[in-house]
Structures are given as C-alpha cells and as structure tokens.
C-alpha cells in the first residue's frame, strides 16, 4: 500500500506515475474524501476546544453557586455531535482504505515507461542457443515418452494439470533440490517450510487481495461452521514475506533471506487460450522462491543480488537466457521495479519467462506493518523483495528442450547428476542404453 501522505503532498504527481503503469487514479474521489475528512477533523477540533472551554466555565459557575444546566446541555450536545462525527470519520477512513488497497505501487524512477511486454528493455544475454542437427521437438513430444502425462492429469483434475512419472519425476525433484542447495549453501538463504493454505489477511499483506481474488483458489474446511474462507498460495512469496507481518525486527537481523520450495496454485483467470499445450501455464506448479527483507537503503542492491542468484541457477545448468527490465505497464501490482529472466526454448525459437525478481520497497511492508528499529531507535518500515529461483516446471521444460538428443533421450545437465544418482541420460525404456 502506498503512503497516503505521498498522495496528500503530490496527488497529481502520483496519478501521473500510476498512469504510466496503466492505472487510472480516481483523483476526484480521493480529493472529495480528503476534503470531507479534513472538514470533519477541523469541526471535531473546534468542538473539542469548545467543550474544554465550557467544562472550565462549568467549574467556575459551580464555584459561584450558579445554575449550570444550560451550559451542561450544550456540552451534551457537543458530545453527541462528536460521536456522530467519529462514526462519519470512520466511514471515510474505510473508503480511503479501500481506495488505497486497490492502488498499485508507484514505479521506481529508473523503470522504463511502456504499455506492455513489447516495451520491456533487454539488459543482457548469457549463453548461445544450441545449434541442432536434427528437427527439434517441444517439451511435450520429448517428455511424453519419458513420463510426462497430461492425459492422466486431465482425468484427475482437468485441464492444466500434469502427472510426472519415473525418470522425468526424478529430474523434476532433482531440479528443486539443486536450486534449494544452491540458494542455502552458496547464496545465504535460510530454507523454510510454510503452509500452503493461508488466511485472507496474509494475501492482503502481499497484495494478492483484494484485486486478484479471481486468480486464487479458495478452500473451505469441511465439517466446520462459520469458518473463514482460506486460500491456496499462488507463490511461497506470500507465506515467506508474511513471516514478519505485525512485527518489529532488530536492525541487526537484517537482511532476512528466506527460500522455500512449494507447489503454487493459480486459476489463470484471463489466460484462456494462452499456452494451452504443455507445462508452461499450469494451475499447479512447483517453484523455489527467494525472499529478502532488508533496510530501505539496501533494497536496490538486494534486487541486483537476487537477480544474480537466479542467474546462477541458469548458468550452472548451462541454459541460455536473457535479463529483461519490465516496463511500467508490465510490472506486477506490488512491484516498484522488476527484472525478468527469460530462458531460451528452442522449440518455440524464443525466450520465455522463468524468473521474476521484484523490489516492492515499503509497499507490502505497509500493508503487513512489518518494521525494524532504525539507528535512532524508531520503528521504520522494511523493504521486501521476492524472486523465483526458479520456476521448477519451466526449468524442466527448458532442460528437456535444450538437452534433447536425436534418439529421443535427454542428457542430464552435469550439475544435476549428483541428484540423479550419477545418471547421465534419461530415455524411454525402449531406447534406454
């Protein structure tokens, strides 16, 4: 959530910056609510001053033995008006809060201005795409003989679900373990296991609610009455970041660096017809997430570091990729600045997103009331960052396509072989060596 003082000081400036990311701030509605709020507060202060004055007057009158009934009646009327004003003020504050919760983050000044993904800016590339001397297959055709089973996934759960069997299931698990080991042993993250089901206030904290409720899977507890609806996490960013909600951490504890491997659940509302083939866009997929909670002055250095951590996974797997700075119109709701990593998929002859690393600055922290005690001993909002390190399913897709062989087998990347019992190649039973 944005700092409301920012809007009070420079409403037109904030409106312009939000317009850059495709959000139209209702300036008239905000201004009207603010004017009403100020009028009520001014009137309340006047009433308070009048009541204080009358209270002193009553004391003096009693000392002189005078009748105070008329003055006391006026004091009672003032009290009634102040109570009514307090109720009205609460209503206005609630409406302001609704407006603020719907507002996305303000883009950092370094973010390129653009309407959509076509105006993102490439920052760098790593690795040269492999030149194949045979017809390249996509991950569906490569993976199906190896245990990639969409038919059973659809039978069990419907479209956009997958069953993995045998060697391909093992390769998927190896990828997740490799990512976790790299982040914990080389990058300084603490491995964390969190619930996959969370309460609504947790989703308000990281910005999924109220705006993106249709993208979430809701769950209800069976056999219980009057229970609050809960949600399956769409990313473990949600649970990891909220571990510091409603708390004040010591400055000495920063940065807090957390990582988790979890399934993620997304309804993919609005994605009808997109990426219907294969594992690119699923309702359930695994991801290794990175989260950092840092002091404000350290957050942009932390963003660069986090991008580097995601890059290290791709480099170690020897998968070609590029880093892209997202433009204002393509950034996520909570982000002030985002870099995407896009991996090369030879069957599509293009780069596809495999990681997104974002600095939300104090946007999520304000919603969560996550603070630290600064050098002056005063509570101050932390900055929160999140990044995929990486999406496991999409990394599996990239390995299948980039490491495929003419005979239908797939070479196991060197970095994954210790997690595969030394296996160097996976193949369908009929073509296994």
UniProtKB/Swiss-Prot annotation:
Pathway: Aminoacyl-tRNA biosynthesis; selenocysteinyl-tRNA(Sec) biosynthesis; L-seryl-tRNA(Sec) from L-serine and tRNA(Sec): step 1/1. It comes from the Bacteria. The gene is serS. Keywords: Aminoacyl-tRNA synthetase, ATP-binding, Cytoplasm, Ligase, Nucleotide-binding, Protein biosynthesis. It comes from Burkholderia thailandensis (strain ATCC 700388 / DSM 13276 / CCUG 48851 / CIP 106301 / E264). This is Serine--tRNA ligase. PROSITE patterns: AA_TRNA_LIGASE_II (PS50862). HAMAP family: Ser_tRNA_synth_type1. Consists of two distinct domains, a catalytic core and a N-terminal extension that is involved in tRNA binding. Catalyzes the attachment of serine to tRNA(Ser). Is also able to aminoacylate tRNA(Sec) with serine, to form the misacylated tRNA L-seryl-tRNA(Sec), which will be further converted into selenocysteinyl-tRNA(Sec). L-serine binds at residues 235-237, 289, 388. It catalyses: tRNA(Ser) + L-serine + ATP = L-seryl-tRNA(Ser) + AMP + diphosphate + H(+); tRNA(Sec) + L-serine + ATP = L-seryl-tRNA(Sec) + AMP + diphosphate + H(+). PANTHER family: SERINE--TRNA LIGASE, SERYL-TRNA SYNTHETASE. Homodimer. The tRNA molecule binds across the dimer. GO terms for biological process: selenocysteine biosynthetic process; seryl-tRNA aminoacylation. One of its GO terms (cellular component) is cytoplasm. ATP binds at residues 266-268, 353-356. It is found in: Cytoplasm.
